Amino acid sequence: MLSIARVSLLRNARMVPVHAMQMRPVVVRRSLHNGSLLLQKKNEKNEAPKSILDDDMLARAGVEVEGNEAGSKDKSGRAGEAGESAEQDDSTGDKGSGKKKRSRKSSTDIKRERYANWFYILSLLGLASGALSMARDWDSDESEELKKEIPNGYTPALMYKRMKRRWESIFTFFQEPPFPDLLPPPPPPPYQRPLTLVLSLEDLLVHSEWTQQSGWRTAKRPGVDYFLGYLSQYYEIVLFSSNYMMYAEKIAEKLDPIHAFITYNLFKEHCLYKDGVHIKDLSKLNRDLGKVLIIDTDENSFKLQPENAIYLEPWDGKADDRLLRLIPFLEYLATQQVSDVRPILKSFPDNKNIPEAFEKRVQVLKEKFERDERVKNDKNLFLKLLGIGLIGTKPKFPLDLIREEGEKNYVRFMKLVEEEKEKIKLQQQAMGQQTFTLKDYVEGNIPTPEEQLKLQMEKQQEIEAQFEEQKKLKAQQGSK
């Protein structure tokens, strides 16, 4: 039946007149529709291939995608072709998708945000409680310097001042020296030296250098032993190193093994750290600043008390007598019983050339002294006629007399030092034999303090007797 219907339709179509052909527009519309479909297919072929995984699926999997920017660009391009209405639809679609993405959070993200919020809250509470604690009234065990000019009270101004002072003290704790007084009180007057001499170690008494062949080597400056030994009879010598204790202590022990010349050792840990430099603050020495003198090779070391300082150029390891030329001036200061060394140091315009300037002054004084003595001899005609004034009666310059007496004392002092060295060696040998093990500590075999003192006294007597025997043997050998 279907085939018969098709044949009848074809025959009827052939018999239609030309002026009645009104169905042709339908055929044309079909061809236009087919052409648009073909163009759409061509455009789809030219487009880039799209992935099966869309942005929603990637976001659920936890992958970060740059879909917002790319999508907005593609949609803006399509909107330009399609019209303003499509642009509005795309923008609204983007906003809606953005809201969905922002609202989509995993359980892990929610926990992280919750923990972060708790952390911020607890941090703020901790800061607030810390500020209130630092603003409290002064405690009885806090230093008076910290409480200076800020009384107790809970007014906002006083609380802020106390909080600020305590906050600043946290940082000054690491900048200030470890103790307010770096040295113990001076001994009583009969045993006290008139002045205190602070000496640097690096590039003043010793010089260290590194070479590829031998590594680190430390050289002792020529005349250091004589300088320390001679001035120790006039000064309380304090060695103040610019290096840390773990490096400089061994060098200091080599300079003075029995502590006969150097009274105290200070190191970089005892410096004041200020403005990026380490400063040797003489006011922390527990001594009268008018009787303290410092010799250093770094001007930053004495920047707080430049009126107490003598500057020397850093020693480069070559032989020189720069250190020994300071002895006459330092000896003059100590023997004149001055109450304040600062005016004398200030009388020298340049503290870098004090030895030369002092030598010129001494030469002028010596010439004046000789002229005065010559005038006295000329006036005494009777002694001149008898020839008494010309034979053995020429007076000596006072500074020369002081130097001669100092040399005698130095010789006697060095003899005592050599004897003490021998005695100290014997003491070290005896102390090395007397040891206690960890087993003795655990079992309680350690003697009481009274017994230890008794043992030490007995050992000391044995050392004294042994030392006297050695002296007798040396005397007998010397007489032979």
Curated annotation (Swiss-Prot):
SMART domains: CPDc. One of its GO terms (cellular component) is mitochondrial inner membrane. It is found in: Mitochondrion inner membrane. It is a single-pass membrane protein. Coiled coil: none annotated. PROSITE patterns: FCP1 (PS50969). InterPro entries: FCP1_dom, HAD-like_sf, HAD_sf, TIM50. Residues 63-107 are annotated as: Disordered. One of its GO terms (biological process) is protein transport. Residues 1-39 form a transit peptide. The keyword ATP-binding does not apply. The chain crosses the membrane at residues 119-135. Gene3D superfamilies: HAD superfamily/HAD-like. Residues 136-480 are mitochondrial intermembrane. The keyword Transit peptide applies. Residues 190-333 form the FCP1 homology domain. Essential component of the TIM23 complex, a complex that mediates the translocation of transit peptide-containing proteins across the mitochondrial inner membrane. Required to direct preproteins in transit and direct them to the channel protein TIM23, and possibly facilitates transfer of the translocating proteins from the TOM complex to the TIM23 complex. Component of the TIM23 complex, at least composed of TIM23, TIM17, TIM50 and TIM21. Interacts with preproteins in transit. This is Mitochondrial import inner membrane translocase subunit TIM50. The gene is TIM50.
